[in-house]
Amino acid sequence: MASDRAETQRRRRQRREQVRALSWRPLMRGSLVERLRRCGRANCACAEDPRRRHGGKFLTVQLDGRTHALHVRPEDEGKVRSAIAAYTQLWKLINELTACELSDLQREARERRRARRRRR
């Protein structure tokens, strides 16, 4: 039991340290998607052939119950991808911290039950 507690505390310290390191990076929740569209010019190849449509990257984010889309220029794509990846990593770390807290609560409940049984 003591080793379980020590292991959980070690994992918790590691995850908190990783969260601190991530907090300095840009974080963004959202998705980067590519939309293929026709440009509207009658002479363009995209008007005839759907495979030749024009592409563009868009960041989609849901805020306050509404979905927002923003065009992302090619030179900004790397920065946006990095911010999304950092947010995803942060979310995983928070889930792992939640698992540590849950493990502690479960262990404490088991210990209380055992202590009550011994008193009887």
Residue positions per predicted region:
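A positively charged, amphipathic N-terminal helix/segment that binds anionic biomolecules
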Residues: 1-120
